[in-house]
């Protein structure tokens, strides 16, 4: 019903192209129209993960004057998908934007894990751009599996040198109300104190990891002094 309503809205305004119709869902099962965006949304990979349908390719087909490659009835919906926006911001400081040099970047991968990223190791995060660095999208057979996969992936997302919201996202995923689907649009505000509670201080581990990522520094530390090289191996 909700899909047919969305299609009806697009037909009513004679819209042709990729777009998004947003609704808000009530506890009694009713849904209410919010807005229509005549473009792909940031969250469009969620649809792609669930359906296996390439929305960008279809958008280009329509722009070229062609029709859709598949009928609505032939588009499957499999499993559950979640998207997380990885942002350079400090959740413990009222989501203040963060800047800095990316000293080390190690993005998660594996079955059911997708990362749409715009950053590289050695890059800079400045005030000239939106704080969103990348999108982490996961897919599972059901919601519990998708949440578990999202938690593992976000915990394995390493960005050193810039403060990010990965810890905050993990706290949301770990919250029992989120896992149960028992939340509303007020969830983040109501649970702000819990979700932004400071975690374990691992700054010393991050500094060590950053140092180990510097090949020049590691080579310098591991270099055998000339005097010891000449002596060769010996035992006392």
Where are these regions (language model features)?
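Conserved metal-phosphate-binding beta-hairpin within the catalytic cores
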Residues: 15-41
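Catalytic cores of soluble metabolic enzymes centered on carboxylation/carboxyl-transfer
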Residues: 6, 24, 45-236
């Amino acid at each position: 019903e909700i899909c047919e309503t969305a299609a009806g809205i697009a037909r009513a305004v004679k819209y042709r192209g990729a777009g998004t119709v947003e609704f808000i869902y009530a506890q009694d099962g009713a849904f209410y129209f919010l807005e229509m965006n005549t473009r792909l949304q940031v969250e469009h990979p969620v649809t792609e993960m669930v359906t296996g349908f390439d929305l960008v390719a279809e958008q280009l087909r329509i722009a070229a004057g062609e029709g859709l490659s598949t009928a609505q009835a032939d588009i499957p919906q499999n499993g559950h998908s979640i998207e997380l926006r990885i942002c350079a911001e400090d959740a413990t400081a009222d989501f203040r934007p963060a800047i800095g040099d990316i000293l080390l970047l190690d993005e998660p991968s594996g079955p059911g894990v997708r990362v749409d990223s715009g950053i590289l190791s050695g890059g800079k995060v400045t005030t000239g751009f939106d704080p969103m660095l990348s999108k982490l999208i996961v897919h599972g057979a059901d919601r519990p599996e998708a949440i578990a996969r999202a938690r593992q992936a976000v915990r394995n997302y390493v960005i050193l040198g810039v403060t990010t919201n990965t810890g905050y996202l993990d706290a949301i995923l770990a919250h029992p109300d989120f896992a149960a689907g028992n939340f509303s649009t007020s969830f983040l505000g109501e649970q702000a104190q819990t979700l932004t509670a400071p975690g374990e201080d691992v700054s010393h581990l991050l500094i060590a990891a950053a140092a180990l990522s510097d090949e020049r520094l590691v080579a310098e530390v591991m270099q055998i002094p000339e005097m010891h090289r000449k002596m060769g191996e010996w035992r006392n």
